[in-house]
């Protein structure tokens, strides 16, 4: 069974983990109401997508993320 020959130093651990950081989420401005939303997603505030109303305004949107 394979076993490490030496203890991994903290600096080497950090170098290995340097690529594990999460990236920034992209945000776009809704063309209808100006609220921030995810690109290519229905606006969670007004229910518009691509200039059209897809979900009735005021209706609770299940599974939406408000940014």
Curated annotation (Swiss-Prot):
It holds the Pfam family Ribosomal_L32p. SUPFAM superfamilies: Zn-binding ribosomal proteins (SSF57829). Residues 1-20 have a biased composition (Basic residues). Coiled coil: none annotated. The keyword Ribonucleoprotein applies. Keywords: Ribonucleoprotein, Ribosomal protein. One of its GO terms (cellular component) is large ribosomal subunit. GO terms for molecular function: structural constituent of ribosome. One of its GO terms (biological process) is translation. The keyword GTP-binding does not apply. Gene3D superfamilies: Single helix bin. Residues 1-23 are annotated as: Disordered. Belongs to the bacterial ribosomal protein bL32 family. PANTHER family: 50S RIBOSOMAL PROTEIN L32, LARGE RIBOSOMAL SUBUNIT PROTEIN BL32. This is Large ribosomal subunit protein bL32.
